[in-house]
Amino acid sequence: PYNTVAYFRIANLPEFKAKLSETSIGKIGNNEDIQSLMSSFYEEFLTAYPEIEEELGMPLDELLDLPQGEVCVAVAVTDTGSVMFFLLVDFGDRIATTDKLLGRLDELVLAAGGSVEKEMVSETEVIVYDNPIDDNSPEVIIKDGTLVVTTNRLMTEHVVAHWEGTATAEQRTFSQNRKFTAIMRSSVGTEEARPHASWYFDPLTLVTATTQGNFAAQAAMAILPTIGLDGFKALGGSVILAPPGFDTISHTHIALAVPRRGVLDLLTFGTGDGTPEPWVPADVPAYITGYWNVDEAYDNLITLLDTVLGEGEFQTQVDENFNLPLDIDLREDIIEGMAGRFTLATWVVPPARINSQSMMIGIELKEGHQLTADLERLIELIPIAEKKSYNNQDYYNIQIPTPPQQPGTPPSRIRIPSPCIAIVGNYIVLTDSEEFFQHAMDTNSSGNDRLADSEEFALIRQHIKNQLGEEQASMITFAQPRDQLQLVLDLVGDDRTKDFLADNSENSRFLGVLSNVMGNAKLPSMDDLTRHLAPSGSVMINNETGLHFIGFSLKPTEE
């Protein structure tokens, strides 16, 4: 119905599975060792949790094979605040499985003291389950090879009316919801590549409807217009599998009101071409860079907080708690020194440990601004900050105290962070790993193996330009999954991981399942997996309708 607040739909599940098998994930899943691993996990899981199939009254495989076409799950609300659930499954010729499933539902409801009746809604037969322990008793329709389950007679009548073609003008459908259609228009793909799955979520309408009569919740909701959050409309998107030239494409759209006010007025994104900085190595697994007009956002923040706290109160708090104690002016000395570009890169610090992935953040500064001197003065106030130099680059290393390690103790599975702060060119660079910092400075000084010069990044960047058309990017991302996948394989295959699972298997059935599976598992080689991998990227566009994200992964060049 029109007032649907949450929705997930797979247009055709068998086609979805077939297309998924053409993607990197599907091809990795077809690896002999991965298939053996998953088969072992499935068997061990069902052995550890026999109640699943006992409750279903059929093998899990049989239930999973039921959908033969569209699958849709939705949640809608009524004007009085009731929540209605909806499930649709095209089961095709799987009528025997459907009958078995409904037979088991009959048994469960009757065993609970409920009843099972058949009623006619217009010209359609509806199975009504009256469950005394659940107010949302299901109603089931079986028609034209399709199973529909609802939890509200209003929803049932709505479905039947549209199915029979007798719907009135008041019985509007979700396809008439302007928020939904606007989001889907931004997420439809091309004629050659239609979405295989789509989704939608409208949290404000859901909360507003379900908190009727709750004074505290309604009081909180009444604040939203004051801070501008009532301008958040909804979000949704789609997934396209194995379209021409790509592995996957995804769309996510956050719909925002025009004009933006309050909190939403802090989303003052700029634009840029996203060329990686000269200190970003080519072997980073992930790179994100975005543009945000901080000074404009800060002014809007002052306006917002003055509305909430009172005129001038925010500035008073900043003066008392920041400016005066540090002898600095937040607005003039820091905010105005930022050029509006922010970057995050990751790197895997060897050897493989649970937190081997480190991060580096770059904040671009305006040329000639005094922020550089102010920053160094503030860092020197930190007692555990040690000034160092590497490759003619000064930096500060934050010395985190660590307990002494006993002789003969095996290497820790946890990496001890070694934070660093530096001014590199016109950037503040912060990282949690000194090894990563030095690796980046090697790249910066040598000019070799830079991400900006890599063929993989150039390819992703060109596809981003193609996706943008006339638009401008406010944020771009780049990812190459090899090192992260290698880290996962190293951790999974580590004897200490197996020992941990074995030691805790008696206290957790699930850990016991993992212990049994991993104890005898043969892991695939990296070469077998990486031939199915290719770089991926995404872009964020800030326009008058809201924020739109386009993500994609490329088809791998195999063999």
Each predicted region: which residue ranges?
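Structural boundary/hinge residues at secondary-structure and domain interfaces
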Residues: 1-128, 132, 175-236, 241, ...
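Short, exposed beta-strand/loop patches in secreted or surface proteins that constitute
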Residues: 116-120, 138-141, 239-241, 384-389, ...
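Short, Gly/Ser/Thr-enriched beta-strand-loop segments that form substrate-interacting elements
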Residues: 122-136, 393-416
